[in-house]
């Protein structure tokens, strides 16, 4: 059995990572989506252990101290991290493991796992991104402003990545992301 690979997927909040990954994973059940841990509150419909591992800040900080994360970062006032052991287990089983993580986490993985493929998902425009975030109706104005400011940084960092996919037309973006992950 061959060893698997790690693919890092990042992009601004609201760019459509979840929508595209759902389509990719339905077409590629052999791939494994790493479940991140976070200190943020669950959104409606999110299930602990399925969408995220929802932890208190104290629990998260204990796991940091015990080096249980492959990467971790603070984003929009919350901590996010990738539990190390499930990723290593799945790679050793020969699977493609997808990490859907923030920019700082992607940079950490680049240092710890330089062979990981790095893919950034971008919106067709900042205006389109803002509209998508507002349509969620899950954030107040201050949170939206923080996310848009962070998005500018993430868009500016696109040149750091191996592959760049623009999420403009859904079918085209799915095909491009599939190629970026599996080819």
From Swiss-Prot:
The keyword Magnesium does not apply. Its EC number is 2.7.4.8. Pathway: Purine metabolism. Residues 4-182 form the Guanylate kinase-like domain. PANTHER family: GUANYLATE KINASE, GUANYLATE KINASE-RELATED. One of its GO terms (molecular function) is ATP binding. Pfam families: Guanylate_kin. The gene is gmk. Keywords: ATP-binding, Cytoplasm, Kinase, Nucleotide-binding, Transferase. ATP binds at residues 11-18. Essential for recycling GMP and indirectly, cGMP. (Microbial infection) Catalyzes the phosphorylation of dZMP to dZDP, when the bacterium is infected by a phage that produces the substrate for the synthesis of dZTP (2- amino-2'-deoxyadenosine 5'-triphosphate), which is then used by the phage as a DNA polymerase substrate. One of its GO terms (cellular component) is cytosol. This is Guanylate kinase. It is an enzyme of class 2 (transferase). Belongs to the guanylate kinase family. It is found in: Cytoplasm. SUPFAM superfamilies: P-loop containing nucleoside triphosphate hydrolases. It catalyses: GMP + ATP = GDP + ADP; dZMP + ATP = dZDP + ADP.
């Amino acid at each position: 059995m061959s060893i698997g690979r790690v693919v890092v997927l990042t992009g601004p909040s609201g760019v459509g990572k979840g929508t595209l990954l759902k389509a990719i994973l339905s077409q590629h059940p052999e791939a494994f989506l790493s479940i991140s841990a976070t200190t943020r509150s669950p959104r409606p419909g999110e299930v602990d252990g399925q969408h995220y591992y929802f932890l208190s800040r104290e629990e998260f900080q204990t796991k940091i101290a015990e080096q249980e994360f492959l990467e971790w970062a603070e984003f929009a006032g919350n901590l996010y991290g990738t539990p190390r052991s499930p990723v290593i287990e799945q790679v050793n089983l020969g699977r493609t493991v997808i990490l859907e993580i923030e920019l700082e986490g992607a940079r950490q993985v680049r240092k710890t796992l330089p062979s990981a493929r790095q893919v950034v998902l971008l919106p067709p425009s900042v205006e389109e991104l803002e509209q998508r975030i507002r349509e969620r109706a899950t954030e107040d104005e201050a949170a939206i402003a923080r996310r848009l400011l962070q998005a500018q940084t993430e868009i500016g960092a696109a040149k750091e990545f191996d592959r760049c996919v623009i999420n403009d037309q859904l079918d085209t973006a799915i095909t491009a992301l599939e190629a970026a992950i599996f080819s």
